[in-house]
Amino acid sequence: MTENALLLLNLGSPDSTRVEDVRRYLDQFLMDPYVVDLPWPLRRLLVSLILIKRPAESAHAYSSIWWDEGSPLIVLSRRLQEAMKPHWPHGPVELAMRYGQPAIEKVLLDLARRGIRRVTLAPLYPQFADSTTTTAEQEVRRVIAAHRLELEVSTLPPFYDQPVYLDALVESVRPYLQQPHDHLLLSFHGLPERHIRKLVKDPAHDLLAENSRNVSPEALALCYRSQCLRTAEAFAERAGLEQGRWSVSFQSRLGRAKWIEPYTDAKLDELVQRGVKRLLVMCPAFVADCIETLEEIGMRGREQFISAGGEDLVLIPCLNDHPAWVGALGEMSGRLARPL
């Protein structure tokens, strides 16, 4: 039987915390038209301006969370790759990053050289966005066309509402929910509003809605924010969370454009003003801990919350290589994958 490789796809990381490595990574990331959706000349100008100061600032942030083994995202993704092998009996399990190493191109060429003819992609993004899911899949298409690879490729679609994914989230978070706390904040990665408006053409679609109940199926399929709300609502129901004891926010905004709300930094101050002293934060848009969780929330967010008057902020780890997540990912990749 022809082997079917499972290719885990995530965003990526600099090779090291050196400023030049961070600059190279940021340049590749920000020059992606799915990330900064401006015409090439404007994008090049904007990114060049960003790269004057941002690499040194980001290098400092990466240094604060870097492990002896390397980038936390890469290390944790490698652990997931290893843990997945017993759950994917159809062929090898490989890992690639959209930016940085291991590059999608290198991994696909290696699979082709080894005689692999079937590949199942597993983009590790629960919710859909052009800047994550689409760009990863488009890079796979580009590599296959550029090298004329004879690969039959299928891909795991976004799984924001899949019961096995939600159950894995609940199981991984449950020990933290059993600790004394006042509130749970689900902080998702943010996105410029225009990224959603380009895809969801319905002018009545509400990007400030507090829940996903009235979202049409057509809008839900394309609206990252609505999918995040759907994940949060389903998680809260499964975890038995009381209304008012949890909320949703969006982090990591960049630049002056309007991003989806509410913003996490503003939400942290609001929760303190509401009397929340002990805060739990989970980041369900990420399946592996990275700079956005460990540094932005676990360090800067915690410092902000305590400085504003809170007593403690506990960052709940991402799914990483939790056994429930490993099993869920294997099951979904086999059951849900569709032709690319």
UniProtKB/Swiss-Prot annotation:
It catalyses: heme b + 2 H(+) = protoporphyrin IX + Fe(2+). GO terms for molecular function: ferrochelatase activity; metal ion binding. This is Ferrochelatase. InterPro entries: Ferrochelatase, Ferrochelatase_C, Ferrochelatase_N. It comes from the Bacteria. PANTHER family: FERROCHELATASE (PTHR11108), FERROCHELATASE, MITOCHONDRIAL (PTHR11108:SF1). The gene is hemH. One of its GO terms (cellular component) is cytoplasm. Its EC number is 4.98.1.1. Catalyzes the ferrous insertion into protoporphyrin IX. Fe cation binds at residues 189, 292. Belongs to the ferrochelatase family. Its main location: cytoplasm. It comes from Pseudomonas aeruginosa (strain UCBPP-PA14). GO terms for biological process: heme biosynthetic process. NCBIfam families: hemH. Pathway: Porphyrin-containing compound metabolism; protoheme biosynthesis; protoheme from protoporphyrin-IX: step 1/1. Keywords: Cytoplasm, Heme biosynthesis, Iron, Lyase, Metal-binding, Porphyrin biosynthesis.
